[in-house]
Amino acid sequence: MNKLYIGNLNESVTPADLEKVFNDHKISFSGQFLVKSGYAFVDCPDEQWAMKAIETFSGKVELHGKQLEIEHSVPKKQRSRKIQIRNIPPQLRWEVLDGLLAQYGTVENCEQVNTDSETAVVNVTYTNREQTRQAIMKLNGHQLENHVLKVSYIPDEQSVQGPENGRRGGFGARGAPRQGSPVTAGAPVKQQPVDIPLRLLVPTQYVGAIIGKEGATIRNITKQTQSKIDVHRKENAGAAEKAISIHSTPEGCSAACKMILEIMQKEAKDTKTADEVPLKILAHNNFVGRLIGKEGRNLKKVEQDTETKITISSLQDLTLYNPERTITVKGSIENCCKAEQEIMKKVREAYENDVAAMSLQSHLIPGLNLAAVGLFPASSNAVPPPPSSVSGAAPYSSFMPPEQETVHVFIPAQAVGAIIGKKGQHIKQLSRFASASIKIAPPETPDSKVRMVVITGPPEAQFKAQGRIYGKLKEENFFGPKEEVKLETHIRVPASAAGRVIGKGGKTVNELQNLTAAEVVVPRDQTPDENEQVIVKIIGHFYASQMAQRKIRDILAQVKQQHQKGQSGQLQARRK
């Protein structure tokens, strides 16, 4: 995406005029300007320079009496499903943006683009061309919180080689390789290991000391700790603090962290700018609840064990542009480093659990995109994309409709209004987004403290709908800033299969709880309903609940399969 289209040009504009404008604004370009009648093309060295040119010039700079309009140059064949939305208010919440995008179709992917501008930029992929066309028509020029959105196509490489072009690919409709293809027939595909970086926030005045003369200090740190360190100097120009990302083993990250802390402490002492420099760790909000623990127990234990004082920034500071919380640790350098190890250990555990759940969802729900669901904002480096291939047979065949599931989710009674929205707008939008039926059951008693949300739809719809409900409750502050959203969910299982969910001596249900971190209860002495089904209760945070639900469905599928095999065997025996 390095090639730019420059529109709204005066007929008299020459390549030299454009070169001068780019040079005056210190925008790098490569090659010659190709000037046509009223428009031109030029290449930039990379995508970052292209974005900088768009932000600097488009609708802001005049040339020969006309305002330049600059966007990515996209060949007609590649104008398909991908668009870029610019000038998004930085404080805008994902929920609002997702709702706006969902009005024009199903969003497959929504990822944030790192830029130097104060406003946010996202790249969006819709399911088909028509949805994308509608989104451009309606969103370009749309006013949102005093910001006018700018929308344009970006290249969709898949459109050139995809089914819309009439070429047969080796992949099915959902992107999974066909069974028997070389990918699935051989050994399992190795997943690229994805590290979770240690991200620090450091005062801007100490960045120079950390880098050192001609980069000597930071080179020494990377060499000694076997790490890769990125100092994000250009982001948030003028900010009092800058982010540093450290990529290495946990031990390497901790060693680099200690060296950086020592450098900052020395610099503060030499310049007499501060008595102490606290350690500030950035962690994605998805992991912070589990770091804090129930009633703050995990965090208190870390404080006690390391003799430090730890505070975490407010949820109110989270925006579309900033999905991370700041964890501030105060104490001696030695103790701060011990706290860093404990904090990152908890964060990595939460990450691994979520990836396990995500991997499971990717296997059971091919094509599921978590960024589109809005649970893992794509700006987060902490979450890898779903596996590109799934070995073995798919749980349900691509030509068979996925099985409908009904799940009961219990929410605080006072949250019903937020889930329904004004004139029912939010629940309708949620239903469309997830492709699920979502209904709120009447209260069991006038003073009920919880209400039941009945969600009916296939696995992917369940994942999306439940994920949004968890997110909405957190966003609307129905749970405290240090409290993780944990909900009770009920699924019905055949009474004959309840024993398989429990296992001998409760072994299966105990393993299920250990694996998923959810509380799973099969109440004893239940009377089966008219369909000979009983309730299984699941209590936990979103990923724990999802993983438990999918594992239980997996057990039920095995029971059903064995039952069908048994019936088939009996039938064959009778024929003989």
Curated annotation (Swiss-Prot):
Locations listed in the record: Nucleus; Cytoplasm; Cytoplasm, Perinuclear region; Cytoplasm, P-body
GO annotations of cellular component type: CRD-mediated mRNA stability complex; cytoplasm; cytoplasmic stress granule; cytosol; filopodium; growth cone; lamellipodium; nucleus
Post-translational modifications reported in the UniProt record: Phosphorylated by SRC at Tyr-396. This residue is involved in ACTB mRNA binding, its phosphorylation impairs association with ACTB mRNA and hence abolishes translational repression. Phosphorylation occurs in close proximity to filopodia and in the growth cones of differentiated neuroglioblastoma cells.
Stored InterPro entries: IGF2BP1_RRM1, IGF2BP1_RRM2, KH_dom, KH_dom_type_1, KH_dom_type_1_sf, Nucleotide-bd_a/b_plait_sf, RBD_domain_sf, RRM_dom
Residues covered by region (Disordered): 158-189
Tissue occurrence: Expressed in neurons and embryonic fibroblasts (at protein level).
Keyword Isomerase attached: no
GO molecular function: mRNA 3'-UTR binding; mRNA binding; N6-methyladenosine-containing RNA reader activity
Family that this chain belongs to: Belongs to the RRM IMP/VICKZ family.
Stated role: RNA-binding factor that recruits target transcripts to cytoplasmic protein-RNA complexes (mRNPs). This transcript 'caging' into mRNPs allows mRNA transport and transient storage. It also modulates the rate and location at which target transcripts encounter the translational apparatus and shields them from endonuclease attacks or microRNA-mediated degradation. Preferentially binds to N6-methyladenosine (m6A)-containing mRNAs and increases their stability. Plays a direct role in the transport and translation of transcripts required for axonal regeneration in adult sensory neurons.
Quaternary structure and interacting proteins, as annotated: Can form homooligomers and heterooligomers with IGF2BP1 and IGF2BP3 in an RNA-dependent manner. Associates with the cytoskeleton, predominantly with actin filament bundles and occasionally with microtubules. In a heterologous system, interacts with ELAVL1, DHX9 and HNRNPU.
Record protein name field: Insulin-like growth factor 2 mRNA-binding protein 1
Organism: Gallus gallus (Chicken)
Taxonomic classification: Eukaryota, Metazoa, Chordata, Craniata, Vertebrata
Gene label: IGF2BP1
